[in-house]
């Protein structure tokens, strides 16, 4: 089962509002520039196409939608600035932020100003555990990813030596700690636990330590730029250990950086829905605009569907809190991801993750 990987090139029309006269404005906050721009571009493409499709059918409750994009560059200060600008423009609905380090501070600003947000990709448990009324997701949580990866390791690789490394950021450390906790509860102890500094180019000190520990696998909590470099430098030092990671590995840029060093690396990711009947309309619409139906794009598309459901159930878009309550009612919501239900803190309550593997430059199921 193949999964399309991230394309950083399909940004068609995503930096422009769609109409000056739309009734409901949906803001998008995510990295259109910067080291993880691939994630933001992909998610934004999904949002744009979903909005196009809703508008072709008359919008939501007869009101047209408009998309306005705010680039956070994956930098917290820029994300906060984007949120304040969005609030100043009176926007009440947001898809995003894309990364967890932005989602946490931005969610506070949006909550204080009665703005409902639905992130297609922020997985930190802290985002929803604080009990803010305005937080929704179309992805799972780090603890769910960590648990899933650890259980997979225990089931298939229990006798292998594994180290755990993270990038000290909200997303990466959250993944690593969740993996470690579940791994240890399952009776497996890592041979080493440590961290690296994101943005650096030389990880020789960490590579030497991992080589010394004779690791068979390394669980890496972090994004693809550091993962790719770590893999490449491990191979250069004669260490054949694949990485295991989270959905930050789901981009062709990982293979571009690491090359064949990425062969066999595993990662948890949202369950591939491209073969499901529920996803076919979205896939057709994405492809019609030359946009690959990739994970973040699918999640972005689904985020608009969830907002549309809530607005329709609430009767209007005038009260974002009423829209949030409608989404969290427990009723199944038909989306591109299939039927999903929400708990009272905005988390999806159904299974959302699977295990995947890099093989010959492509992503295949590892189940």
Segments the model singles out, each with a brief description of its role:
Residues 17-19:
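N-terminal signal peptide c-region/cleavage motif recognized by signal peptidases
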Residues 2-7, 21-367:
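Extracytosolic ligand-binding ectodomains
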């Amino acid at each position: 089962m193949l999964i399309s990987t991230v394309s950083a090139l399909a940004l068609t029309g995503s930096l422009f509002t769609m109409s000056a006269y739309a009734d409901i404005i949906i803001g998008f906050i995510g990295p259109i520039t910067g080291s993880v721009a691939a994630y933001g571009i992909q998610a934004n493409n999904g949002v744009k196409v979903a909005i196009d499709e809703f508008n072709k059918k008359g919008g939501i409750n007869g009101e047209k939608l408009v998309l306005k994009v705010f680039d956070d560059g994956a930098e917290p200060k820029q994300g906060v600035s984007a949120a304040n600008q969005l609030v100043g423009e009176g926007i009440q609905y947001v898809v995003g932020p894309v990364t967890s380090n932005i989602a946490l501070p931005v969610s506070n600003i949006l909550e204080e100003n009665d703005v409902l947000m639905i992130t297609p990709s922020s997985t930190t448990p802290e985002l929803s555990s604080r009990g803010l009324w305005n937080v929704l997701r179309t992805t799972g949580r780090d603890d769910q990813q960590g648990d899933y990866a650890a259980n997979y390791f225990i089931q298939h690789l229990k006798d292998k030596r594994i180290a755990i490394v993270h990038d000290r950021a909200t997303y990466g450390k959250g993944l690593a700690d969740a993996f470690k906790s579940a791994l240890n509860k399952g009776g497996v102890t890592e041979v080493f636990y440590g961290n690296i500094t994101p943005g650096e180019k030389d990880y020789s000190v960490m590579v030497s330590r991992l080589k010394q520990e004779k690791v068979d696998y390394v669980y890496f909590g972090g994004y693809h730029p550091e993962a790719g470099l770590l893999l490449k430098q491990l191979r250069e030092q004669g260490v054949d250990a694949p990485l295991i990671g989270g959905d930050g590995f789901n981009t062709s840029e990982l293979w571009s950086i690491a090359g064949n060093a990425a062969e066999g690396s595993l990662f948890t990711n949202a369950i591939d829905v491209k073969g499901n009947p529920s996803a076919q309309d979205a896939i057709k619409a994405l492809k019609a605009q030359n946009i690959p139906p990739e994970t973040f794009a699918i999640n972005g598309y689904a985020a608009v569907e969830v907002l549309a459901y809530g607005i329709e159930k609430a009767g209007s878009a005038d009260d974002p809190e009423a829209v949030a309550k409608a989404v969290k009612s427990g009723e199944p919501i038909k989306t591109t991801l299939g039927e999903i239900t929400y708990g009272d803190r905005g988390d999806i309550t159904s299974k959302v993750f699977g295990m995947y593997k890099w093989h010959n430059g492509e992503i295949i199921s590892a189940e």
